[in-house]
């Protein structure tokens, strides 16, 4: 659904910023 699409976009954005802040 729309939530999945938004989630993918957010993940892609985080990756573009240098990866998700897992160790932050």
UniProtKB/Swiss-Prot annotation:
Any one annotated GO CC term: extracellular region
Gene Ontology biological process terms from the UniProt entry: defense response
Subcellular localization(s) per the UniProt record: Secreted
Keyword annotations: Amphibian defense peptide, Antimicrobial, Secreted
Main location: secreted
Tissue specificity field: Expressed by the skin glands.
Entry keyword Secreted: yes
Family in the record: Belongs to the gastrin/cholecystokinin family.
Functional summary from the UniProt entry: Antimicrobial peptide.
Name of the molecule in the record: Caerulein precursor fragment BM1
Organism, scientific name: Xenopus boumbaensis (Mawa clawed frog)
């Amino acid at each position: 659904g729309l939530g999945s699409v938004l989630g993918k976009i957010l993940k892609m954005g985080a990756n573009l910023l240098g990866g998700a802040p897992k160790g932050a």
